[in-house]
Swiss-Prot record:
Subunit structure: The basal body constitutes a major portion of the flagellar organelle and consists of four rings (L,P,S, and M) mounted on a central rod.
Annotated gene: flgI
This protein's UniProt keywords: Bacterial flagellum, Periplasm, Signal
Compartments, as annotated in UniProt: Periplasm; Bacterial flagellum basal body
UniProt family annotation: Belongs to the FlgI family.
Any one GO biological process: bacterial-type flagellum-dependent cell motility
Role: Assembles around the rod to form the L-ring and probably protects the motor/basal body from shearing forces during rotation.
Protein name per its UniProtKB record: Flagellar P-ring protein
Primary localization: periplasm
GO molecular function per UniProt: structural molecule activity
GO cellular component: bacterial-type flagellum basal body, distal rod, P ring; outer membrane-bounded periplasmic space
UniProt-listed InterPro entries: Flag_FlgI (IPR001782)
Length: 342
């Protein structure tokens, strides 16, 4: 039987052992990237550009030539050396005029390849319609698997800044990346302990309002806040990718004793010691597996998802079969952790 490999990735999910910095689990509201987009032309393609049937490309070429005082009808242009593209980029917070940002280019016509071409100067707009950057540059051979998209490192220059006065603010808001009542209160109490009462107040499971002490500027205060360690409570969760067979799980997630059957495989999960020593294999964490009867024992201790997966691997269950068994365990109530199926 062909062996099917299942990649099992264990991430720490201990509620008491996760020590994080506040800056790792929370962001500052208002301090974020802004998305930019633009429409432009890639020139210099060796016959791999859009065909003459792409009317918007031919019209764009005509408009570009007219901007340099060359007038020609779009119907008279037969070039295959030009491709119409969309350019996207992220404008980071506090970026200044003259700073460079990376851009991503994607063909929108019927070009065969945009590799080796040159992006003509293209304005990049934000959702407010204003131009914030100008993009231009040569497209070097990058991803050979996709000839219709490319990245240009430092391919755009920032022309307009997003105004944000952080220095004179007295209060800001922190937003937890993963909403949790316990974590919100933990951040509140930790900040009040470090800086004094009433510096922080949790408004909901995601939001903590902070007020800077008078002895700090807001920049100094946020710099200190982000470096403060905190005991972070992570939610027990299992993520299953049915297509690839990948399982991401916390190592301490408990599986209660049960008998589960999926397709032609039956697995008994128990805390009772095994009697059949002849067919018993010792697994990690004091777990034993009776391969003759497909019985997994934790020898009186809690059974974890890690042990269950290792047992299934030992008895030759396929990746698809493992996913089915885990789903069955969740539906039966043997696993209380949240499960997300991709």
């Amino acid at each position: 039987m062909k062996r099917v490999f299942l990649w099992l990735i264990f991430v720490l999910a201990f509620h008491k052992l996760l020590a994080e910095k506040i800056g790792d689990i929370a962001s500052v509201v208002g301090v974020r990237d802004n998305q930019l987009i633009g429409y432009g032309l890639v020139i210099g393609l060796n016959g791999t550009g859009d065909k003459s049937g792409s009317k918007f490309t031919m019209q764009s070429i005509s408009n570009m030539l007219e901007s340099v005082n060359v007038k020609i009808s779009a119907d008279d242009i037969k070039s295959k050396n030009v491709a119409a593209v969309m350019i996207t980029a992220s404008l980071p917070p506090f970026a200044r005029q003259g700073d460079k940002i990376d851009i991503h280019i994607s063909s929108i016509g019927d070009a065969k390849s945009i590799q080796g071409g040159t992006l003509v100067m293209t304005p990049l707009n934000a959702v407010d319609g204003n131009i914030y950057a100008l993009a231009q540059g040569a497209i070097t051979s990058g991803n050979s698997n996709n000839l219709l998209s490319a990245n240009i490192i430092n391919g755009a220059t920032i022309e307009r800044e997003v105004s944000y006065d952080l220095f004179h603010k007295n209060a800001m808001t922190l937003s937890l990346k993963n909403p949790n009542f316990k974590n919100a209160i933990q951040v509140q109490n930790t900040l009040n302990k470090v800086f004094g009462n009433k510096v922080a107040i949790a408004l909901d499971p995601k939001t903590i309002q902070i007020t800077r002490p008078e002895r700090f500027s807001m920049v100094e205060f946020l710099a200190l806040v982000q470096e403060i360690p905190i005991n972070y409570s992570a939610k027990n969760k299992i993520i299953v990718d049915e297509k690839s067979g990948t399982i991401v799980s916390g190592v301490d997630i408990i599986v209660h004793p049960i008998v589960v059957t999926s397709q032609d495989i039956t697995l008994k999960i128990t805390k009772e010691p095994l009697n059949d020593s002849k067919n018993t294999q010792d697994l990690d964490n004091n777990m034993s597996l009776d391969t003759a009867h497909n019985t997994l024992s934790s020898n009186g201790k809690n059974i974890t998802i890690a042990g269950v997966v290792k047992a299934l691997q030992k008895i030759g269950v396929s990746a698809k079969g493992m996913v089915s068994i885990l789903q069955a365990l969740k539906k039966s109530g043997a696993i209380s952790a949240e499960m997300e199926i991709l």
